[in-house]
Protein backbone atom coordinates (compact mmCIF):
# COMPACT_ATOMS: atom_id res chain seq x y z
CA UNK A 1 0.00 0.00 0.00
CA UNK A 2 1.34 3.41 -0.93
CA UNK A 3 0.04 6.74 0.27
CA UNK A 4 1.70 10.05 -0.37
CA UNK A 5 0.31 13.52 -0.02
CA UNK A 6 0.98 16.94 -1.44
CA UNK A 7 -1.26 19.43 0.28
CA UNK A 8 -0.42 22.51 -1.77
CA UNK A 9 -3.66 24.04 -2.99
CA UNK A 10 -2.04 26.56 -5.30
CA UNK A 11 1.35 26.73 -6.94
CA UNK A 12 0.61 29.53 -9.42
CA UNK A 13 0.14 33.11 -8.17
CA UNK A 14 -1.90 33.92 -11.29
CA UNK A 15 -4.55 31.50 -10.05
CA UNK A 16 -4.78 32.97 -6.58
CA UNK A 17 -8.52 33.50 -6.88
CA UNK A 18 -9.23 30.39 -8.96
CA UNK A 19 -10.28 27.46 -6.83
CA UNK A 20 -8.72 24.07 -7.55
CA UNK A 21 -10.65 21.11 -8.91
CA UNK A 22 -10.76 17.89 -6.88
CA UNK A 23 -10.91 14.34 -8.15
CA UNK A 24 -11.67 11.92 -5.34
CA UNK A 25 -12.14 8.16 -5.24
CA UNK A 26 -15.06 7.50 -2.91
CA UNK A 27 -14.41 3.77 -2.67
CA UNK A 28 -16.96 1.79 -0.66
CA UNK A 29 -19.75 3.50 1.33
CA UNK A 30 -17.73 2.34 4.34
CA UNK A 31 -15.24 5.09 3.50
CA UNK A 32 -17.50 7.30 5.63
CA UNK A 33 -16.59 5.19 8.69
CA UNK A 34 -13.26 3.65 7.66
CA UNK A 35 -11.34 6.70 6.52
CA UNK A 36 -7.94 5.06 6.16
CA UNK A 37 -5.21 7.54 5.26
CA UNK A 38 -7.24 9.16 2.49
CA UNK A 39 -9.96 10.63 4.69
CA UNK A 40 -7.61 12.66 6.93
CA UNK A 41 -5.65 13.82 3.86
CA UNK A 42 -8.87 15.13 2.31
CA UNK A 43 -9.87 16.82 5.56
CA UNK A 44 -6.52 18.56 5.86
CA UNK A 45 -6.72 19.68 2.24
CA UNK A 46 -10.26 20.96 2.75
CA UNK A 47 -9.11 23.06 5.70
CA UNK A 48 -6.38 24.60 3.56
CA UNK A 49 -8.86 25.37 0.79
CA UNK A 50 -11.21 27.12 3.21
CA UNK A 51 -8.34 29.17 4.63
CA UNK A 52 -6.90 30.13 1.25
CA UNK A 53 -10.21 30.73 -0.53
CA UNK A 54 -12.56 32.55 1.87
CA UNK A 55 -14.75 33.34 -1.13
CA UNK A 56 -15.83 29.66 -1.32
CA UNK A 57 -19.60 29.80 -1.80
CA UNK A 58 -20.57 26.41 -3.17
CA UNK A 59 -19.62 22.97 -4.44
CA UNK A 60 -20.52 21.39 -7.76
CA UNK A 61 -19.96 17.63 -7.59
CA UNK A 62 -20.45 14.81 -10.11
CA UNK A 63 -21.25 11.33 -8.80
CA UNK A 64 -21.59 8.10 -10.83
CA UNK A 65 -24.45 7.07 -8.57
CA UNK A 66 -26.74 9.49 -10.37
CA UNK A 67 -27.04 8.35 -13.96
CA UNK A 68 -29.78 9.70 -16.20
CA UNK A 69 -30.67 10.10 -19.84
CA UNK A 70 -29.45 13.50 -20.92
CA UNK A 71 -27.74 16.06 -18.71
CA UNK A 72 -29.13 17.09 -15.33
CA UNK A 73 -28.20 19.20 -12.33
CA UNK A 74 -29.71 19.10 -8.84
CA UNK A 75 -31.64 22.23 -7.83
CA UNK A 76 -33.03 20.88 -4.56
CA UNK A 77 -32.66 23.58 -1.85
CA UNK A 78 -32.53 20.94 0.92
CA UNK A 79 -31.28 17.74 -0.71
CA UNK A 80 -30.76 15.65 2.42
CA UNK A 81 -28.72 12.44 2.72
CA UNK A 82 -29.68 9.39 0.66
CA UNK A 83 -28.38 6.08 1.97
CA UNK A 84 -28.50 4.47 -1.46
CA UNK A 85 -26.95 1.12 -0.53
CA UNK A 86 -27.81 -2.03 1.38
CA UNK A 87 -26.20 -4.59 3.65
CA UNK A 88 -23.86 -2.29 5.56
CA UNK A 89 -23.55 -1.70 9.33
CA UNK A 90 -26.34 0.22 11.04
CA UNK A 91 -23.95 3.04 11.97
CA UNK A 92 -23.57 3.93 8.30
CA UNK A 93 -27.30 4.56 7.92
CA UNK A 94 -27.25 6.91 10.90
CA UNK A 95 -24.82 9.31 9.24
CA UNK A 96 -26.22 12.54 7.85
CA UNK A 97 -24.66 15.22 5.67
CA UNK A 98 -27.08 18.15 5.99
CA UNK A 99 -25.45 20.57 3.55
CA UNK A 100 -27.96 22.91 1.91
CA UNK A 101 -28.56 22.93 -1.82
CA UNK A 102 -28.00 25.99 -4.00
CA UNK A 103 -30.69 26.46 -6.71
CA UNK A 104 -29.13 29.73 -7.90
CA UNK A 105 -25.81 27.96 -8.52
CA UNK A 106 -27.67 25.17 -10.33
CA UNK A 107 -29.05 27.85 -12.65
CA UNK A 108 -25.52 29.14 -13.26
CA UNK A 109 -24.50 25.61 -14.24
CA UNK A 110 -27.44 25.38 -16.64
CA UNK A 111 -26.57 28.75 -18.18
CA UNK A 112 -22.94 27.79 -18.75
CA UNK A 113 -23.94 24.51 -20.35
CA UNK A 114 -26.41 26.33 -22.57
CA UNK A 115 -23.66 28.73 -23.67
CA UNK A 116 -21.57 25.67 -24.57
CA UNK A 117 -24.43 24.18 -26.60
CA UNK A 118 -25.25 21.50 -24.02
CA UNK A 119 -28.95 20.96 -23.38
CA UNK A 120 -29.70 20.23 -19.72
CA UNK A 121 -32.48 20.22 -17.15
CA UNK A 122 -32.76 20.66 -13.37
CA UNK A 123 -34.08 18.16 -10.81
CA UNK A 124 -35.54 19.87 -7.73
CA UNK A 125 -36.19 16.59 -5.87
CA UNK A 126 -32.81 14.89 -6.09
CA UNK A 127 -31.06 14.06 -2.76
CA UNK A 128 -27.32 13.66 -2.28
CA UNK A 129 -26.26 10.06 -2.97
CA UNK A 130 -23.29 8.44 -1.27
CA UNK A 131 -21.00 9.23 -4.17
CA UNK A 132 -21.41 12.87 -3.17
CA UNK A 133 -21.91 12.97 0.59
CA UNK A 134 -19.37 10.33 1.62
CA UNK A 135 -16.31 12.14 0.20
CA UNK A 136 -17.71 15.54 1.20
CA UNK A 137 -17.92 14.33 4.81
CA UNK A 138 -14.13 14.27 4.71
CA UNK A 139 -13.44 17.33 2.56
CA UNK A 140 -16.00 19.67 4.18
CA UNK A 141 -17.11 17.92 7.38
CA UNK A 142 -19.05 20.92 8.72
CA UNK A 143 -21.60 20.46 5.89
CA UNK A 144 -22.07 24.22 5.78
CA UNK A 145 -21.10 24.84 2.14
CA UNK A 146 -24.05 24.56 -0.29
CA UNK A 147 -23.84 21.61 -2.69
CA UNK A 148 -25.11 21.13 -6.22
CA UNK A 149 -24.85 17.61 -7.65
CA UNK A 150 -24.41 16.88 -11.34
CA UNK A 151 -25.56 13.65 -12.97
CA UNK A 152 -23.42 11.39 -15.12
CA UNK A 153 -25.28 10.99 -18.42
CA UNK A 154 -26.05 7.41 -19.41
CA UNK A 155 -24.00 6.31 -22.43
CA UNK A 156 -21.75 9.39 -22.28
CA UNK A 157 -18.17 8.84 -23.37
CA UNK A 158 -15.03 10.39 -21.93
CA UNK A 159 -15.02 13.34 -24.34
CA UNK A 160 -18.63 14.21 -23.55
CA UNK A 161 -18.01 14.14 -19.80
CA UNK A 162 -14.88 16.25 -20.32
CA UNK A 163 -17.00 18.84 -22.17
CA UNK A 164 -19.41 19.05 -19.23
CA UNK A 165 -16.57 19.98 -16.90
CA UNK A 166 -14.84 22.28 -19.36
CA UNK A 167 -17.98 24.38 -19.74
CA UNK A 168 -17.94 25.07 -15.99
CA UNK A 169 -14.33 26.25 -15.68
CA UNK A 170 -15.32 29.87 -15.04
CA UNK A 171 -17.13 28.90 -11.83
CA UNK A 172 -13.73 28.32 -10.24
CA UNK A 173 -13.10 32.08 -10.37
CA UNK A 174 -16.50 32.71 -8.79
CA UNK A 175 -16.03 30.90 -5.49
CA UNK A 176 -17.05 27.40 -6.58
CA UNK A 177 -15.17 24.19 -5.79
CA UNK A 178 -15.70 21.62 -8.55
CA UNK A 179 -15.43 18.00 -7.41
CA UNK A 180 -15.50 14.78 -9.42
CA UNK A 181 -16.28 11.71 -7.33
CA UNK A 182 -15.53 8.33 -8.84
CA UNK A 183 -13.02 5.55 -8.25
CA UNK A 184 -9.59 5.02 -9.71
CA UNK A 185 -10.33 1.29 -9.79
CA UNK A 186 -13.73 -0.33 -9.35
CA UNK A 187 -13.94 -4.10 -9.77
CA UNK A 188 -16.77 -5.06 -7.44
CA UNK A 189 -16.46 -8.80 -8.07
CA UNK A 190 -12.92 -8.72 -6.75
CA UNK A 191 -13.87 -6.31 -3.95
CA UNK A 192 -16.56 -8.63 -2.64
CA UNK A 193 -14.14 -11.53 -3.04
CA UNK A 194 -12.42 -10.24 0.07
CA UNK A 195 -8.90 -9.70 -1.25
CA UNK A 196 -6.58 -8.00 1.24
CA UNK A 197 -3.27 -7.96 -0.61
CA UNK A 198 -2.98 -5.09 -3.06
CA UNK A 199 -3.41 -6.46 -6.57
CA UNK A 200 -0.62 -5.54 -9.00
CA UNK A 201 -3.05 -4.40 -11.68
CA UNK A 202 -4.53 -1.80 -9.31
CA UNK A 203 -1.17 -0.08 -8.90
CA UNK A 204 -0.21 -0.43 -12.57
CA UNK A 205 -3.48 1.05 -13.82
CA UNK A 206 -3.48 3.89 -11.29
CA UNK A 207 0.09 4.92 -11.99
CA UNK A 208 -0.55 4.84 -15.74
CA UNK A 209 -3.43 7.26 -15.25
CA UNK A 210 -1.26 9.50 -13.08
CA UNK A 211 1.46 9.59 -15.74
CA UNK A 212 -1.00 10.62 -18.45
CA UNK A 213 -2.67 13.24 -16.26
CA UNK A 214 0.66 14.80 -15.29
CA UNK A 215 1.80 14.82 -18.92
CA UNK A 216 -1.49 16.28 -20.16
CA UNK A 217 -1.94 13.40 -22.59
CA UNK A 218 -5.67 13.86 -23.10
CA UNK A 219 -5.95 11.89 -26.34
CA UNK A 220 -4.31 8.90 -24.68
CA UNK A 221 -6.63 9.27 -21.69
CA UNK A 222 -9.68 9.49 -23.93
CA UNK A 223 -8.57 6.16 -25.43
CA UNK A 224 -8.00 4.61 -21.99
CA UNK A 225 -9.92 1.37 -22.60
CA UNK A 226 -7.43 0.44 -25.33
CA UNK A 227 -4.33 2.19 -24.00
CA UNK A 228 -4.29 1.62 -20.24
CA UNK A 229 -2.89 -1.57 -18.72
CA UNK A 230 -5.59 -3.82 -17.24
CA UNK A 231 -8.30 -1.30 -18.19
CA UNK A 232 -11.21 -3.73 -18.27
CA UNK A 233 -10.13 -5.45 -15.08
CA UNK A 234 -9.80 -2.12 -13.30
CA UNK A 235 -13.19 -1.01 -14.64
CA UNK A 236 -15.48 -3.78 -15.96
CA UNK A 237 -17.93 -0.90 -16.47
CA UNK A 238 -16.83 2.69 -16.97
CA UNK A 239 -19.20 4.78 -14.84
CA UNK A 240 -16.82 5.13 -11.87
CA UNK A 241 -13.93 6.19 -14.11
CA UNK A 242 -15.75 8.76 -16.23
CA UNK A 243 -15.99 11.46 -13.51
CA UNK A 244 -12.22 11.79 -13.90
CA UNK A 245 -12.90 13.56 -17.20
CA UNK A 246 -15.31 16.00 -15.55
CA UNK A 247 -12.41 17.02 -13.29
CA UNK A 248 -9.94 17.23 -16.17
CA UNK A 249 -12.33 19.35 -18.21
CA UNK A 250 -12.94 21.74 -15.33
CA UNK A 251 -9.20 21.86 -14.66
CA UNK A 252 -8.49 23.00 -18.19
CA UNK A 253 -5.26 23.41 -20.08
CA UNK A 254 -2.06 23.43 -18.11
CA UNK A 255 -3.56 22.24 -14.83
CA UNK A 256 -1.15 20.32 -12.63
CA UNK A 257 -2.24 17.46 -10.39
CA UNK A 258 -1.21 17.58 -6.73
CA UNK A 259 -1.80 14.11 -5.32
CA UNK A 260 -3.46 13.86 -1.92
CA UNK A 261 -3.66 10.06 -1.77
CA UNK A 262 -2.46 6.96 -3.56
CA UNK A 263 -3.87 4.60 -0.96
CA UNK A 264 -5.34 1.21 -1.88
CA UNK A 265 -8.14 -0.11 0.34
CA UNK A 266 -9.39 -3.70 0.55
CA UNK A 267 -6.75 -4.79 -1.95
CA UNK A 268 -8.68 -3.65 -5.01
CA UNK A 269 -10.00 -0.09 -4.52
CA UNK A 270 -7.46 2.54 -5.50
CA UNK A 271 -8.39 5.63 -3.49
CA UNK A 272 -6.44 8.10 -5.62
CA UNK A 273 -7.34 11.71 -4.94
CA UNK A 274 -5.74 14.78 -6.45
CA UNK A 275 -6.30 18.50 -6.83
CA UNK A 276 -5.90 20.22 -10.19
CA UNK A 277 -4.57 23.78 -10.10
CA UNK A 278 -3.61 26.30 -12.77
Outline where the language-model segments fall.
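Internal, conserved structured core segments that host functional sites
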Residues: 106-160
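Solvent-exposed alpha-helices and their adjacent loops that cap or buttress functional pockets
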Residues: 13-15, 51-52, 139-143, 170
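Short, basic/glycine-rich phosphate-binding loops at helix/coil junctions
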Residues: 22-23, 84-89, 140-148, 222
